[in-house]
């Protein structure tokens, strides 16, 4: 049985997908980009600010499912420029305890939705 997770505290999906799906005790989030949930505008001031917005969006989705970043077991990070890895990693690290951080991959891709610089998806378990 699956349950669709939605929250007004994260951006409305820009396509035919859910913010997240809970199956049993496992949450599968869709990729989040730096859309501000209230205005629908992209937050692209700089890569650190953009990444923080992505993580705040993800936090809202996790909370809507009754979870926190401590429940995350896997993150997938897609970036348009590998030279931004350090700045993205610095912001990302603020949301996790290093000793219990999830598994993760970071992949440079040619393009992302709305031509953003970073997109992150996660898997979490209660």
What are these regions, as identified by a protein language model?
Residues 2-126:
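Short, polar/acidic, helix-capping and beta-turn segments at strand->helix junctions
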């Amino acid at each position: 049985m699956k349950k669709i997770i939605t929250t007004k505290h994260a951006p409305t999906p820009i396509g035919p997908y859910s913010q997240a799906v809970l199956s049993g005790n496992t949450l599968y989030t869709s990729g989040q980009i730096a859309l501000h949930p209230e205005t629908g505008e992209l937050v692209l001031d700089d890569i650190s600010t953009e990444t923080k917005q992505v993580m705040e969006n993800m936090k809202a989705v996790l909370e809507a499912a009754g979870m926190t970043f401590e429940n995350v077991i896997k993150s997938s990070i897609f970036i348009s420029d590998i030279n931004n890895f350090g700045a993205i990693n610095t912001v990302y690290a603020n949301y996790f305890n290093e000793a219990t951080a999830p598994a993760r991959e970071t992949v440079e891709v040619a393009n992302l939705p709305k031509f953003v610089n970073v997109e992150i998806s996660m898997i979490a378990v209660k």
